[in-house]
Amino acid sequence: MNKKINISIVGTGLMGLQHIKAISKSKKANLHSIVDISNNAKNLSKKYKIPLYSNVDELLNSKNLDAVIVATPNQLHEKHTVSFLKKKIPVLLEKPISDNINSAKKIIGSANKNKTPLLIGYHRRHNSIVSKVKELIDKGKLGNIVSANVLCWLYKHKDYYKEKWRISKGGGPLGINLVHDIDMICYLLGSIKYVQAFTTNKTRKFAVEDTATISLIFNSGALCTLNLSDTIVAPWSYELTAGENPAYPITNQSAYMLSLIHI
């Protein structure tokens, strides 16, 4: 019988909690420990009967650790992730990889230098429907893709922003939500050649954007527009069409549109 993988969760916020629940039910993984300083983390430690560490260094000094999931605020991704990569501990890092390009490059560089697995949490590309669409595109069964349009309009209640990192540099719906859509459209259409983008914080007045539009040109010549806002009540977003999360109603309205031609 294969040994279970001992995984620690760094950060017990919204996504960290989801990982904790998933691992606790897994037949292939074991919940090794959690790292956080919140009162909620103390309660989770008692509930799941696992060690609680107050910082990454304490975890690194523990025994029998096989891998970690980093689910801390975006601004802390580099600091936490590189600490594990240097010790050659595989990391599943919640998206986005970081809050800026230089930091992202350092994380990737550390993974390559230490020859240690690093996976970013873009789970949507593993959806069976997305995988099938990818297969059909790659085999040319859908013809040539000329353009694509992606909508990500999902209203967020003001309580969502009680977490201050979400309204600080490195937060905002671009890094929290639209990164999923950008990853998936690139997964389907390939590498990007040109980018043009506009953002505004006109509605919420936070230090981060609440609305954005992005225009892309892919190496294939295909064009794409992505339209994002977390201030609009609307039926068009992946969350409302995929049915992955029971917390969201299913609208059956397409948030992704591909235009194709057969030559």
Regions found by a protein language model. Name each.
Residues 1-48:
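N-terminal Rossmann-like dinucleotide-binding module
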Residues 33, 67, 147:
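Short, Asp-centered acidic motifs that coordinate Mg2+ and/or phosphate
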Residues 50-56:
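Conserved SAM-binding strand-loop segment of SAM-dependent methyltransferases
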Residues 54, 93, 120, 196-199:
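Short loop/edge segments at beta-strand edges and connector loops
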Residues 62, 67-74, 78-125, 140:
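Beta-strand-loop-alpha-helix segment that lines the small-molecule cofactor/substrate pocket
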Residues 124-207, 212-216, 223, 236-238:
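Predominantly a Rossmann-like dinucleotide-binding segment in NAD(P)-dependent oxidoreductases
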Residues 233-247:
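Short, surface-exposed loop/helix-turn segments at secondary-structure junctions
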Residues 261-263:
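Conserved small/polar residues in nucleotide/adenosyl-binding loops
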